[in-house]
């Protein structure tokens, strides 16, 4: 109060007013405050104050030659007065308007290329459809989402190298472009940005948007792919949502979606093979998604999904430390436990050996359609707060939490025997047995759980065993909340190990993932997935198995032919014949195999009965474990197109048709390739011609190694001996001549000698 009086007093004196309004501010502290550093201390005030002046902008002197002094309205555009302290001119804001309307045009060709992500966004919005607005409570949960549609998946470091190479190609600095995607992008962008006049810094910013995935931890109630996130502010508020269908898709979302489908298919297939881990790796390495190798995508793509994480673990990559159970992602937020094996009795008096977690723990559970907070002690559920989209989703979460709690009343609620098996026909572990049992029918579980009266807590409500809401009673410890539970925000990744059966463990030995956790949901991939591994031939059904098997034999005929005569057992055990077995009726597989193997042996023994077409046609049948029987077959049955179709042992059929003239094989009407040699014509002439320059010494001699094909003979040195496989499937020993002079006589003697050697 005193100070104010004093100030008023001062202001009443005319001299004070004059000093404050007319003289310069010369207090050192104030001058320091407003002049130290380049940082503007009050930008908005400065801006308003500047724009109130007549000429707030400075420009290069050359502007006076490019812009008239006055515009059409006679307003002055620039001042003849120089800017104090520089040789620039003072310019009016009106000059900017004049320049925008009348200034020179530059080429705009590069704009859509540089601002590609913006142009594409406009197109998506133009073609998108906005539906009605609904007012309802929004259960949003924070998830890590991709906020940048249309990007490649380079790491920040990789992108930096690409940008430097594209924008500043002549700058010095070590940059190594190694990955295929880096090289492709660099080449593409250099081409696109020839003679680009846009400032390099801007180009660099825009390239970064295009190359790197940007994620944010945002509250989301609906779709999480980037084309939905870019309109999040338009589609969901606190109490409303607006329906929206994007007007286009972007490759990064398609890759994420296709990667999940490929990974699920591969994990499911690997789980049923003899060595799941080896098979999984073989498939990951031989699969392409949208033309890019799956292993490259796995290294770069941060998608977290059970199957994808199993594939990453197999490749030795780090994954999230949360674990999966019943399709929910669990993250322990506090507490700890030790594990102990314990035997328990089900309601059906079946003994189960379960690993009990002893100790108090709290978890967040996040699923696609429901989330929860779970507090538990040793074999006891203390509290479960669930929120979900609908009754069904809430029930799923409750079942998973009840099983996870390992409570006795849950185990006693089992009716009937637990004998669930996985795809490979192996029994599931006890926890998954229980889960499957209650997922089929949870009535008894919910009835036996017990109910309790509840307090009225804001935003919470009770739920009864029949899944109806209630404000008075609820299942013991269970409440339904209006608020969702956020996904675990940390993006930390941990080192994990994986065993032969694809169980992924953290360094403490806790199981984080297993094939049982991989969703059975089938989807159609957005990008083409090319599985080169024979294990995945069956993904497209029986016809694909049939065609692929025969294509494989034809492609590898040279080596197959040699193995057929030298080491048939090894050939029969090839994994490429595995998928074919599922097409042959189980009851007769063994007999077919025995019959075909006997037939092949006769071909090897009896001269001149080698028949290429027949070997190719029957070979896949010989792969099954043979049963010895006297049965003869004129045709063999395969199950395709919903019924048994016949392959004739001698001659063509719709299933297997070889055209002698074109040498093309068609399987079920689909082209299966061309045979490089003609199977049915007497090939002795051809062979004797090829054997010119070689002396035939006699029968095969094992000391000289496995039989070579005729094509491989050219590698022999003069005087070198080798076994060679000739057209009839017979093997003879030859020596490359030391002199060229006698070559002509070879072809005549060859034919005679072959006969003698064989007989």
Curated annotation (Swiss-Prot):
Positions bearing the site annotation: Mammalian adaptation: 627
Positions of short motif Nuclear localization signal: 736-739
Full protein name: Polymerase basic protein 2
Statement: the UniProt record of this protein carries the keyword ATP-binding: no
Statement: the UniProt record of this protein carries the keyword rRNA-binding: no
A GO BP annotation: symbiont-mediated suppression of host gene expression
UniProt-annotated location(s): Virion; Host nucleus; Host mitochondrion
Keywords: Cap snatching, Eukaryotic host gene expression shutoff by virus, Eukaryotic host transcription shutoff by virus, Host gene expression shutoff by virus, Host mitochondrion, Host nucleus, Host-virus interaction, Inhibition of host innate immune response by virus, Inhibition of host MAVS by virus, Inhibition of host RLR pathway by virus, Inhibition of host RNA polymerase II by virus, mRNA capping, mRNA processing, Viral immunoevasion, Viral transcription, Virion
Primary residence: virion
A GO cellular component annotation in the UniProt record: virion component
Family: Belongs to the influenza viruses PB2 family.
GO MF annotation terms: RNA binding; RNA-directed RNA polymerase activity
Physiological role: Plays an essential role in transcription initiation and cap-stealing mechanism, in which cellular capped pre-mRNAs are used to generate primers for viral transcription. Recognizes and binds the 7-methylguanosine-containing cap of the target pre-RNA which is subsequently cleaved after 10-13 nucleotides by the viral protein PA. Plays a role in the initiation of the viral genome replication and modulates the activity of the ribonucleoprotein (RNP) complex.
Subunit structure: Influenza RNA polymerase is composed of three subunits: PB1, PB2 and PA. Interacts (via N-terminus) with PB1 (via C-terminus). Interacts with nucleoprotein NP (via N-terminus). Interacts (via N-terminus) with host MAVS (via N-terminus); this interaction inhibits host innate immune response.
Annotated Pfam families: Flu_PB2_1st, Flu_PB2_2nd, Flu_PB2_3rd, Flu_PB2_4th, Flu_PB2_5th, Flu_PB2_6th, Flu_PB2_7th
Superkingdom to which the source organism belongs: Viruses
């Amino acid at each position: 109060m005193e100070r104010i009086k004093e100030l008023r007093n001062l202001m009443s004196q005319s001299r004070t007013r004059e000093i404050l309004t007319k003289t310069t501010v010369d207090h050192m502290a104030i001058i320091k405050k407003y002049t130290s550093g380049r940082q503007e201390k009050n930008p908005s005030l400065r801006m308003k104050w500047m724009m109130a002046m007549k000429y707030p902008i400075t420009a290069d002197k050359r502007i006076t030659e490019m812009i008239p002094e006055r515009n059409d309205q006679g307003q002055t555009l620039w001042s003849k007065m120089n800017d104090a302290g520089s040789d620039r001119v003072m310019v009016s804001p009106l000059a900017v308007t004049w320049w925008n309307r009348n200034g020179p045009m530059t080429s705009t060709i590069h704009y859509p290329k540089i601002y590609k992500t913006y142009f594409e966004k406009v197109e998506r919005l133009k073609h998108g459809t906005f539906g009605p607005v609904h007012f309802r409570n929004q259960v949003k949960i924070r998830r890590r989402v991709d906020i940048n549609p249309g990007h490649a998946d380079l790491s920040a470091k990789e992108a930096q190298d690409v940008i430097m190479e594209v924008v500043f190609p002549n700058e010095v600095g070590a940059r190594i472009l190694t990955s295929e995607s880096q090289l492709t992008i660099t080449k593409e962008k250099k081409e696109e940005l020839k003679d680009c006049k846009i400032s390099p810094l801007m180009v660099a910013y825009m390239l970064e948007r295009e190359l790197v995935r940007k994620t944010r931890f945002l509250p989301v109630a609906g779709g999480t792919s980037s084309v939905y996130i870019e309109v999040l502010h338009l589609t969901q508020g606190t109490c409303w949502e607006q329906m929206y269908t994007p007007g286009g898709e972007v490759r990064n979302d398609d890759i994420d979606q296709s990667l999940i489908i490929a990974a699920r298919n591969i994990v499911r297939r690997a789980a049923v093979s003899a060595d799941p881990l080896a098979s999984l790796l073989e498939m990951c390495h031989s699969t392409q998604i949208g033309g890019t190798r799956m292993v490259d995508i796995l290294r770069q793509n941060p998608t977290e999904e059970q199957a994808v994480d199993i594939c990453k673990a197999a490749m030795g990559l780090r994954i999230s430390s949360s674990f999966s159970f019943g399709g929910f992602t669990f993250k322990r937020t506090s507490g700890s436990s030790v594990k102990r094996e314990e035997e328990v009795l089900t309601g059906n008096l079946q003994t189960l050996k379960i690993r009990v977690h002893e100790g108090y723990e709290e978890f967040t559970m996040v699923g696609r359609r429901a989330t929860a907070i779970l507090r538990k002690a040793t074999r006891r559920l203390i509290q479960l707060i669930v929120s979900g989209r609908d009754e069904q989703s809430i029930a799923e979460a409750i079942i998973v939490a009840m099983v996870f709690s390992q409570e006795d009343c849950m185990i006693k609620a089992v009716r009937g025997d637990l004998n669930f098996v996985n795809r490979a026909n192996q029994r599931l572990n006890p926890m998954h047995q229980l889960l499957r049992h209650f997922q089929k029918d949870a009535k008894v579980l919910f009835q036996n759980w017990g109910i309790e009266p509840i307090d009225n807590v804001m935003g919470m409500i009770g739920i009864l065993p029949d899944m109806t809401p209630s404000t008075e009673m609820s299942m013991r410890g269970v409440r339904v909340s209006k608020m969702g539970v956020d996904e675990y925000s940390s993006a930390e990744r941990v080192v994990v190990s994986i065993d032969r059966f694809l169980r992924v463990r953290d360094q403490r030995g806790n199981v984080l993932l297993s094939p049982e956790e991989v969703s059975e949901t089938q989807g159609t991939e957005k990008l083409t997935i090319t599985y080169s591994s024979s294990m995945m031939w069956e993904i497209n059904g029986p016809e694909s198995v049939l065609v692929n098997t025969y294509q494989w034999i034809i492609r590898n005929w040279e080596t197959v032919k040699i193995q057929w005569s030298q080491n048939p057992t090894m050939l029969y055990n090839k994994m490429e014949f595995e998928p074919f077995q599922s097409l042959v009726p189980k009851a007769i597989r063994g007999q077919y195999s025995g019959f075909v193997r006997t037939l092949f042996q006769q071909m090897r023994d009896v001269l001149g009965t080698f028949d290429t077409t027949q070997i190719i046609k029957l070979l896949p049948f010989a792969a099954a474990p043979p049963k010895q029987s006297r049965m003869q077959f004129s045709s063999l049955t395969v199950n395709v197109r919903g019924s048994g179709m016949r392959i004739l042992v001698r001659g063509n059929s719709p299933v297997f048709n070889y055209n002698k003239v074109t040498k093309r094989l068609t399987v079920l009407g689909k082209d299966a390739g061309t045979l490089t040699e003609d199977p049915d014509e007497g090939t002795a002439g051809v062979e004797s011609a090829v054997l010119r320059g070689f002396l035939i010494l006699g029968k095969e001699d094992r000391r000289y190694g496995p039989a070579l094909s005729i094509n491989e003979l050219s590698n022999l040195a003069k005087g070198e001996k080798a076994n060679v496989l000739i057209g009839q499937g017979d093997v003879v020993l030859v020596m490359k001549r030391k002199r060229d002079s006698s070559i002509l006589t070879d072809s005549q003697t060859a034919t005679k000698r072959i006969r003698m050697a064989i007989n």
